[in-house]
Amino acid sequence: MNNDNNHNTIQEFDVNLICDFFLNTNRQGPGSPEATLKALSFINNLTVQSLIADLGCGTGGQTMVLAQHTPGSITGLDFFPEFIECFNRNAEKLNLQDRVKGVVGSMDALSFEKESLDLIWSEGAIYNIGFERGLNEWRNYLKPGGYLA
């Protein structure tokens, strides 16, 4: 860390500390299965053909709840490879690997096709790029009538 004037920058922060701290927790942010299900209760019309993305999914605590209560395929995206490795192990443990997969990526550079998603989920993670920016950019990836939660 930079000791000049006691100013530290995020570039000097060791992001491995984040992984070490959060890797063995069920969730990497606020929330609970009950909160996930409450938010999900406002979303309807999902089918087995629905495509869902969980942006900033971490190790997948909320993603696995979504998968157990929705049809369709879910892609979880997170910046940290260690979280995605754990995410995919969790999907296998719950026998969800056929419709739930984790990928490493950045929520500010999505690789999804425009207007391809029925639901974009980001439980406690959109703040990483800013709420307004996330809404403005991510809505382009939603099908007409799609949801962002």
Residue ranges, per PLM feature:
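N-terminal, positively charged/glycine-rich alpha-helical extensions of SAM-dependent methyltransferases
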Residues: 1-20
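Class I SAM-dependent methyltransferase Rossmann-like catalytic core
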Residues: 18-30
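Conserved alpha-helix/loop element of class I SAM-dependent methyltransferases that forms part
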Residues: 29-48
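A structural alpha-helix within SAM-dependent methyltransferase catalytic domains
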Residues: 40, 64-67, 135, 139
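Class I SAM-dependent methyltransferase SAM/SAH-binding core
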Residues: 53-55, 59-109
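A short acidic, Gly/Pro-enriched loop at the edge of an enzyme's catalytic core
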Residues: 108-119
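A short SAM/SAH-binding and catalytic strip from SAM-dependent methyltransferases
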Residues: 119-132
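A short glycine-rich, Lys/Arg-flanked "PGG" loop and its adjoining helix->strand segment in the class I
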Residues: 133-147
